[in-house]
Amino acid sequence: GLVSSIGKALGGLLADVVKTKEQPA
């Protein structure tokens, strides 16, 4: 559903932010 898609998108964004913090480019 829509909520599930939004949750997945937010989860992906959070994962990217955490990755960037742990391993600065």
UniProtKB/Swiss-Prot annotation:
Location in the cell reads: Secreted
Keyword list (alphabetical) reads: Amphibian defense peptide, Antibiotic, Antimicrobial, Secreted
Q: Name one GO biological process term.
A: defense response to bacterium
A GO CC annotation given for this chain: extracellular region
Give all cystine bridges in this chain. Answer: none
Task: Please list the tissues where expression of this protein has been recorded.
Answer: Expressed by the skin parotoid and/or rostral glands.
Q: Which Pfam families match?
A: Antimicrobial24
Q: Which InterPro entries match?
A: Frog_Litoria
The text of the family note is: Belongs to the frog skin active peptide (FSAP) family. Caerin subfamily.
Query: Function, please?
Result: Antibacterial peptide, that adopts an alpha helical conformation which can disrupt bacterial membranes. Each caerin displays a different antimicrobial specificity.
State what protein this is by name: Caerin-2.4
UniProt source species: Ranoidea caerulea
